[in-house]
Amino acid sequence: MTPEQHFILSLLSPMKTFPMVIPGHLRARIDRYRILRAQAGEDLNLSDIVRQALTLFAYARPVSWPTAEMDGQGKAVNVKLPSVVIEHVEGLAGFYNETKSDIARAAIVWFLDQEERGQHEPNRIAQ
């Protein structure tokens, strides 16, 4: 089984709760994305978008990513994620001596940047 196949199959495992804090400026950006997706007929909530962002980030395994600073307007959220995605975020947090929320916020910014460039398909992310 290839690593990609293993990753895809692991997404079928039961979801676990992942707590994180999302700053106000990032919530605003997520809301703009949610509105655009709604206009395209895709009804997504905050958890859906965060789950999609972290899953694609874990799958693509980019070698660099942007940061997302806290702004004093952060709100805690609990997102259901596949175990493999949580393990990826935890691994990066440990390796780079960051918090899991720091990595998760960076993943969301990375995802939204990809979406804005129209590069959200997995085969285009790797390029």
Where are these regions (language model features)?
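Long, compositionally biased, charged low-complexity segments
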Residues: P3-S10, L36, D113-R117
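Generic hydrophobic/packing signal
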Residues: P19-V21, L26, R34-R37, L54-F57, ...
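Feature targets compositionally biased, intrinsically disordered low-complexity regions
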Residues: A40, D71-Q73, A93, R117
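Short, basic amphipathic alpha-helical segments that act as recognition/interaction helices
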Residues: E42-T67, K100-N123
